[in-house]
Amino acid sequence: MLRYKIDILEQLKEKGYTSYKLRKDKLIGEAQIQKIRNGELASKETLNTICKLLSCQPGDILEYIEIDE
């Protein structure tokens, strides 16, 4: 299972991107922001945007956790 290694919204906020600014500037939509808040995986396009805004690689924000089924 993939999960976030960092608090995405907090890191974006530290860079000056509040959830309001993300929506207003049409960088990330409300539905994707809600997914991130709920710990759900955002879309590939949203992950691309996050990596661009944070100047990072996907591996910096995501990690794989093995779950026994």
What are these language model-derived features?
Residues 13, 24, 52:
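Alpha-helical residues within the helix-turn-helix
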Residues 39-52:
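Short, basic-rich loop-to-helix N-cap that marks the start of a DNA-contacting helix
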Residues 2-3, 11, 27, 35, ...:
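Short, charged recognition helix plus adjacent turn
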Residues 18, 43-46, 57:
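Residues that mark the N-terminal boundary/hinge immediately upstream of a DNA-recognition element
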Residues 16-35:
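Short alpha-helical DNA-recognition segment
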Residues 1-21:
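A short, Lys/Arg-rich alpha-helix, primarily the initiator
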